Amino acid sequence: MARIFENLNHENKLKVKQALTQLIMPNVDSAEYRMAFSELGSELGILITEKYPDLGNVLLVCASEDADWLAKGLIDSLHHNIGLAVLWSNRITICQDPKIEVSEINKSYVDMEGDTCDTMIVVKSIISTSCVVKSQLNYLVKRVNPQKIIIAAPVMFVSAKESLMNEFPASVSSKFKFLTFAIDDVRDDKGVVLPGVGGMVYPKLGLGNQVEKNSYMPQIVRDRVFASSRA
């Protein structure tokens, strides 16, 4: 099956396809890679606003590597004062055949008004398996009790939605709304989705390997901490 596109229209089709193509270009530099994710984040934000105009109190959830580009692009396009949860995690393979991975959250930054939210938006560069998003949801859902959970990514693997739905009881999964622009169904022998987002995200963003990216403090977090200290 060739890549399937979703949620494209006259307004966003060219920009979204150009950004997705930029991600998979050979030897793309980190500045261009970051810019492509910023553009895709912006377009996801516009799409969310169009589909769900009544978001209420919002908490945006992302991994640390997605915060400054994909997540910030989404936040800036929402024109909405929203909370932010940034999670740092390690992805660990616990079995090779079949391949089973878990994601362990080792630190977090959560900035939100009040104890609960109406809408939780989980945004990720690519949803290949349920691993990372499952950990993020387990970490936060009971804490903030969202009424709606929007799971958004520029690219998803064909079975990602079903995998995530199966990881949670109906009381949680019934709240899920999935949004993407591209669905792929091919993996290489290492499990990397093709064409996906061009491979491993961390080094392409200029953040190094998994250990190095976990030492990166996103600028969006720095800005929020500084703003709260000045308030």
Language model features with spans:
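PRPP-associated nucleotide enzymes
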Residues: 1-231
